[in-house]
Amino acid sequence: MQVPKNNIYTVSRLNGEVRQILEGQLGKIWLNGEISNFSTPSSGHWYLTLKDHFSQIRCAMFKGRNQSVSFKPVNGQQVIVKGAISVYEPRGDYQLLIESMLPAGDGLLAQQFEALKMKLAALGLFAADTKRALPKNIQRIGVITSPTGAAIRDVLHVLARRDPSIEVIIYPTQVQGENADINICQAINIANQRLEVDVLLLTRGGGSLEDLWCFNSEALAHTIYNSALPIVSAVGHEVDTTISDYVADVRAPTPSAGAELLSQDSDNKSQRLATVLARLKQSASHYQLKQERRLSLLEHRLQRLDPKRTLQQFEQRFDEMQLRLEAALTNKLHGLSRRQQQLASRLEQQSPKHKLALEANRLSYLATRLQDAMQDKLSHSGQRIKYVAHQLETVSPLATLSRGYSITTDVNGAVITSASQISLGDTITTQLSNERLMSTVTRLP
């Protein structure tokens, strides 16, 4: 036997190349097997053997990975693991480095979950550009959950503490077990038909993967995606993730976190009240200025017109505008008052009574000033109209006639200013202040 000179492997080289081949070709795999020889040394790492009826393989799961496992493995337990094949070169043993571990039942569900997740992602149901923003001023929240579970108690407690003015409408549904996903879809569809809430909160407490499985339904994913109402998914605990979390517009880690996300504390409510009152004040001021400009324009047009009838029409229009202005301002003030009362009632449990009293006094003071300013402006406008009417009467031809003058016209209505315009026997008309005279020409100069 001739020994080659340049192609002799060392043991380390052989084990290294075997490791590269195994790791490069197999990559990450899922493996089902029974645990044996399970050990937990002081390092915190796990060492075990996975076997079936015919074969076995050594496995290792390091401390950084096994801390995320939600159960304590025991010998004889069937599990599904995900990991990568590697070679432990010092001994030449090949082994599986485990990254995640699930009980055998949950493992099958996890595979189904990953498959559905990939399918829905490819259809675009998780796309960020399809997510809708939550309403800024939430008045009603629709909660889709079991009416007797811990989740609804947590949600109601948080909302009562943070913002008792928010109304809650519960759409009761089954949240675990057979047909639970169908019941949830029906509740979402009912809420979309009624359109009586601003946002939907889909929620339930924690549980095993099997307990939460109804939230991993493909039908439920499409129902959430097609909902006209924005949906917040708050299912389980922070470590739990469901398909509904991926499809929903917003995901909250717990039911309580979902309620906090959809509510504001009382301090923010007070700030919003002050902002609303300031905007209403500005709106009333702008409306008054607009009406003043309109009255000024009417006065200018009135000065360019002559007859009393036109003046009377403008006076009538002015009266109508006055009534409309008074009604508009009254409605504004009533609206401000109603809004203040509503907000005061909503904030009563948070006891912002002192701030509301100050704002109410301020509103009353502004309303009084606005009313006084309106009356002053209307009085001033009335006086100006009377002055304009007097000026029009002064230059009117009828005023000239009332001072003893007269106007004579021929049968065609032409004003006679010279005797040369008439002949003997012509009929002429003389207009006095309040009556007319008919005459026949009998003599000419």
UniProtKB/Swiss-Prot annotation:
Q: Which family does it belong to?
A: Belongs to the XseA family.
Q: Which UniProt keywords apply?
A: Cytoplasm, Exonuclease, Hydrolase, Nuclease
Biological process, per Gene Ontology: DNA catabolic process
EC number of the protein? 3.1.11.6
Q: What does the UniProt function comment say about this protein?
A: Bidirectionally degrades single-stranded DNA into large acid-insoluble oligonucleotides, which are then degraded further into small acid-soluble oligonucleotides.
Any one Gene Ontology cellular component term annotated for this protein: cytoplasm
Q: What is this protein called?
A: Exodeoxyribonuclease 7 large subunit
Q: Which major enzyme category is it?
A: hydrolase
| InterPro entries according to UniProt | Exonuc_VII_L, Exonuc_VII_lsu_C, OB-fold_nuc-bd_dom
* Pfam family membership, one: tRNA_anti_2
Q: Which organism is it from?
A: Shewanella oneidensis (strain ATCC 700550 / JCM 31522 / CIP 106686 / LMG 19005 / NCIMB 14063 / MR-1)
Give GO MF terms, alphabetically.
exodeoxyribonuclease VII activity; nucleic acid binding
Task: Report the subcellular localization.
Answer: Cytoplasm
Instruction: From the UniProt record, list the reaction(s) this protein catalyses.
Output: Exonucleolytic cleavage in either 5'- to 3'- or 3'- to 5'-direction to yield nucleoside 5'-phosphates
Where this protein primarily resides, as one coarse class?
cytoplasm
Q: What do we know about how this protein assembles, alone or with others? A: Heterooligomer composed of large and small subunits.
